[in-house]
């Protein structure tokens, strides 16, 4: 049965919840894409940043008290939140509050995900929540957290973990769990070397989405206990959850499904360059799994004031056009051909250039007579006339970063250009 979210209201349950978004991660597997920005600040989908997805899920779910915990190279992330997320109504108790690493308790930065929350425990307590919703700030998905909160209360859980089945070959990157017939978690291993398949699924296993609901008092107790633990890495997946299970507390798994019905939901980690490229180009499809045009579950973001995209020249030898593509505001396609690509804002492509199967981030300038295929161009790249990318991977490896799947990542530094943009 399809849910009608147009009449969604803020329930007492969501009002009693404080969301903490962990947004301090570096995302080192994204290579040079995170050299100057935190992973949650990485642009995605033509006009968004990754952090917009958990933030939008909170707002759409009715969870309007939100804290964002930052650490690694947070300037562009902080600026994005300040510019795009100032619409919350403070007089109604709504807010998006930034919590930078600031050595509040000890002379050290956040040592792990649990330590990040522990170091801000006084602020969390000051908001007096009944429940605490802890979210990873670096995943792309749509989810109604109200459903998960109701599930948590109905099952009388101390902690609830959002979960999804992932391919066994990818499970090393996640926390993997086992559950009984009532979805009570019986085992949890963070990033196992040899993950085991779920019963009845030979090529999949049940993985944590990095989404947790805690009874607030229970969370405080566990964080204080873990802070004094010897040789702890102070991480929810590595330390907190296994410790809770050893003490036989009630930890329940919440199977993730699509916000529009009961189908398995869209959820992407976009933790590698290949995954990032795939996730962006999936959006071009006729009916992509992630529908950015869904008016019932909008993804909110900072809206730059830009003119419409412009396609110029219609001569036989040069025609500005894009097919099977998404082109954002401020772009000028001047006698160039764009195919199966995603262009972010303010991208200029000059005459006789071809761009195919590529993701072009904001403020990129591409010269004349260029051929670019299966590439990611980072923000601010200025591609000289006649440049060829993606046709000779051995040559590309000498200048750029090339993935196992043959995606070529290009940054301004790789092109010999000075850093000019806040990314």
Swiss-Prot record:
What positions does the entry give for alpha-D-glucose 1-phosphate binding?
110, 175, 190-191, 208
* Matches recorded under InterPro entries: ADP-Glc_PPase, ADP_Glu_pyroP_CS, GlgC_bac, GlmU/GlgC-like_hexapep, NTP_transferase_dom, Nucleotide-diphossugar_trans, Trimer_LpxA-like_sf
| Coiled-coil stretches noted in the UniProt entry, renumbered to this chain | none
* Enzyme class, broadest EC rank: transferase
What is an annotated GO biological process for this record, any one? glycogen biosynthetic process
Enumerate the UniProt keywords alphabetically. ATP-binding, Carbohydrate metabolism, Glycogen biosynthesis, Glycogen metabolism, Nucleotide-binding, Nucleotidyltransferase, Transferase
List GO molecular-function terms, semicolon-separated. ATP binding; glucose-1-phosphate adenylyltransferase activity
Metabolic or biological pathway, per its Swiss-Prot or TrEMBL entry: Glycan biosynthesis; glycogen biosynthesis
What are the EC numbers?
A: 2.7.7.27
Q: Which CDD domains match?
A: ADP_Glucose_PP, LbH_G1P_AT_C
Q: What does the record give as the reaction this protein catalyses?
A: alpha-D-glucose 1-phosphate + ATP + H(+) = ADP-alpha-D-glucose + diphosphate
Give the family this protein belongs to, as stated in its UniProt record.
Answer: Belongs to the bacterial/plant glucose-1-phosphate adenylyltransferase family.
Relate the assembly described in the record.
Answer: Homotetramer.
Which purpose does this protein serve, as stated in its record? Involved in the biosynthesis of ADP-glucose, a building block required for the elongation reactions to produce glycogen. Catalyzes the reaction between ATP and alpha-D-glucose 1-phosphate (G1P) to produce pyrophosphate and ADP-Glc.
Protein name, UniProt field: Glucose-1-phosphate adenylyltransferase
Instruction: Give the source species.
Output: Nitrosococcus oceani (strain ATCC 19707 / BCRC 17464 / JCM 30415 / NCIMB 11848 / C-107)
What is the organism lineage in this UniProt record? Bacteria, Pseudomonadati, Pseudomonadota, Gammaproteobacteria, Chromatiales
């Amino acid at each position: 049965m399809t849910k009608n979210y147009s009449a969604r209201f803020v329930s007492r349950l969501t009002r009693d919840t404080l969301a903490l978004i962990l947004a301090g991660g570096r995302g080192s597997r994204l290579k040079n894409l995170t050299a100057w920005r935190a992973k949650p600040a990485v642009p995605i989908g033509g006009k968004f940043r990754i952090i917009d997805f958990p933030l939008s899920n909170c707002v759409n779910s009715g969870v309007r008290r939100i804290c964002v915990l930052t650490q690694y190279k947070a300037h562009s992330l902080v600026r994005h939140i300040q510019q795009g997320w100032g619409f919350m109504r403070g007089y109604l108790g709504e807010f998006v509050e930034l919590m930078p690493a600031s050595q509040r308790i000890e002379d050290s930065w956040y040592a792990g995900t649990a330590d990040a929350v522990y170091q801000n425990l006084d602020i969390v307590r000051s908001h007096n929540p009944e429940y605490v919703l802890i979210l990873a700030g670096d995943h792309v998905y749509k989810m109604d957290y109200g459903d998960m909160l109701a599930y948590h209360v109905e099952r009388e859980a101390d902690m609830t973990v959002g979960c999804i089945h992932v391919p066994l070959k990818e499970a090393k990157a996640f926390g993997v769990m086992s559950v009984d017939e009532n979805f009570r978690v019986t085992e949890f291993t963070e990033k196992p070397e040899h993950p085991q398949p779920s019963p009845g699924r030979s090529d999949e296993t049940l993985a944590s989405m990095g989404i947790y609901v805690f009874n607030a008092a229970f969370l405080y107790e566990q964080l204080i206990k873990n802070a004094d633990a010897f040789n702890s890495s102070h991480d929810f997946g590595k330390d907190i959850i296994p410790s809770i299970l050893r003490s036989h507390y009630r930890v329940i798994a919440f199977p993730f499904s699509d916000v529009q019905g009961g189908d398995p939901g869209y959820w992407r980690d976009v933790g590698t360059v290949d995954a990032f490229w795939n996730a962006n180009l999936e959006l071009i499809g006729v009916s992509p799994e992630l529908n950015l045009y869904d008016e019932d579950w909008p993804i909110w973001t900072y809206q730059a004031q830009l003119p419409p995209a412009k396609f110029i020249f219609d001569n036989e030898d040069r025609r500005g056009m894009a097919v099977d593509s998404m082109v954002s505001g401020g772009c000028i396609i001047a006698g160039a051909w764009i195919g199966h690509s995603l262009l972010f804002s303010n991208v200029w492509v000059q005459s006789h250039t071809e761009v195919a199967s590529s993701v072009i981030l904001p403020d990129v300038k591409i010269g004349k007579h260029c051929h670019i295929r299966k590439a990611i161009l980072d923000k601010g790249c200025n591609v000289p006339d006649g440049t060829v990318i993606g046709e000779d991977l051995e040559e590309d490896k000498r200048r750029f970063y090339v993935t196992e799947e043959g995606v070529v990542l290009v940054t301004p530094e790789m092109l010999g250009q000075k850093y000019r943009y806040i990314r």
